[in-house]
Amino acid sequence: MREVNFNIPNVNKASVNITTTLYDRRALDCTSTLPLINSLNHLAYLTTSSARIRDILTVDGGIERLVCILKEGRSRDLMEMWKWSLAFQCVVNIGVRGSESVRTRVVEADMVPVIATILDNYIKVVDKARARADSESQRQSSRHHSKAVPTSNDVSGRPSFLEQPLTAEQRTSRRHAPPSIEIPPQPFFQENHVADSNVLDVTSPSRVPMTSPPERSAFGQDVHHRRTNDGRFAHGNHRHRMQPLATALPSMDATDGFGLRPVRDNERLPSMLPGFHTGLTSQPDSPTTPNAPVQPRSSAQATIARQRPSLRQQQSASGESDDGNGDGSTMDEDPASTEAAEPIVGLQNRMDIDDVGDRDTILGGVSDSHDLTVTDPSEEQEAETFNITHRSTVDGSMINTDNAQNNAALGLSPTQAADNANSPALVPSPYSLYFRDRTTTAAHGVLTTMPRDEDVLMSLQLLAYVSKYCNLRSYFQHSHFVPKLKIDRELQMLEEGTSPIEFPEDEDEYLLPDDVNIFPLVEKFTVRHHSKDMQYWACVVMRNLCRKDESRGGIRQCAYYKCGKWEEFQRQFAKCRRCRRTKYCSKDCQKAAWVYHRHWCHTTP
């Protein structure tokens, strides 16, 4: 029987591998991990820069082989995890940068079940982390409240903190905002803040809001003294017994209100302190002058930096427009969403200014439990540096061909050429930080097997590019989960005080029914507590669901996933009055779908 590990003895090669100048399909069949990682590392570069390589992979079985590597599951071994990540990067490059035929082949190679499993795992981990964090915070708040409760006479005779009369100075300070801070208009997602807070309240009553990074959360010294000298903040013990006021304040952009300056060491928040995040390096203010003062930008420059380039502007390497033929699929086409002060990607548009004065208390509470108030990773880097394919892997748009050739002659990987000072530091998810601080074996097991934020982000982006083809919609609405990629066992180990459940052996994947609709999974990422990038790409996918099928006479499908009814003729279904894009066959479907549709329903004039 033929050995799958091909070798070339005459050139002293133990295995065939892929280089930056040579593609050999036999290298993907290698069963040894190290040479396969080497080949996948170079293939990631080739799939980014060469349209011909992407086309070849669709006809020689290369995509199927990459999907098989992904379906083998994530292992706790570092080399196996590296192999899985590189294979996933290659498939995303092929699907995002390829032509319509190439993207069709990616979907036909059964990539959708892999994406569905990744999204489902991430949702389960987020729900588990939030549930455990809420229960822990409630226990801590109840224990703290029991220790700090005064006598009954004092309670009956003294008004509460919220009932105390305000002095004239305090009333004035409450009525008027500080002169150095300007509050911009509320974003579009805060229209239903009161209605949403009952279901999707991210900040629990006992958590302390924290802001990052240092270059975009610098507070003026006058603001600091004004808040610390205010009588409302003199009672530090009341802060832990009430919900932070930051949840009731409208979000604001730091760059629009006041000029930024370097942060002194004695003014740093916990998230700014060196060594607070182990193994992470913060992004400098400037790639060339890390300690240079940050200059205030004009409103026009800030607006440009906050705007995300639409899919219409992101051309694939093969020269095809990524937006298809009309019926736009991006959020940029919504004039109301662009005119409202809601940046999709870019500078930090939210600053929790409450409880900043008492920094010692904040530092003292860091070690107890991690705050799961989500800080958006996309807000910690400039819009021009945002790239969905993270810079630690190869990005052909940033690589100089001369340098790549020189590195190849020296035996270096192109990854080293792309990894420079402009590469932003990847900020871990607050949920991964939550599990990382837990010393139990089960928590570390979940941490090693849970999808990374980059994996979820690339999955959503890949779906955004392939879901706009209506002839492929059946692949998204009738899919399944990959058994070897599921993390139900690891999540079950986190349950304390429960007997372990004996899970049945995983069935073969080909025996599983295709009863999973991926659109409800994607719709859950449009909720606010996910990062802005996840919300953006999830909204693009959901808007692609509203496209009309030109091959069937321009009819549309009911947007409620449990219905899925198609129009019998054009304009049979009524559109949503707010977004004028989503169609429903009945009022009942519209009411049932509004629970999540409100998060990606944007007003159009």
Curated annotation (Swiss-Prot):
Binding site for Zn(2+): 576, 579, 597, 601
Compartment(s): Cytoplasm
Region (Disordered): 134-187, 203-352
Keywords assigned: Cytoplasm, Metal-binding, Sporulation, Zinc, Zinc-finger
Ranges of Acidic residues composition bias in the record: 320-336
Keyword Cytoplasm: yes
First and last residues of each zinc finger (MYND-type): 560-601
Protein name: MYND-type zinc finger protein samB
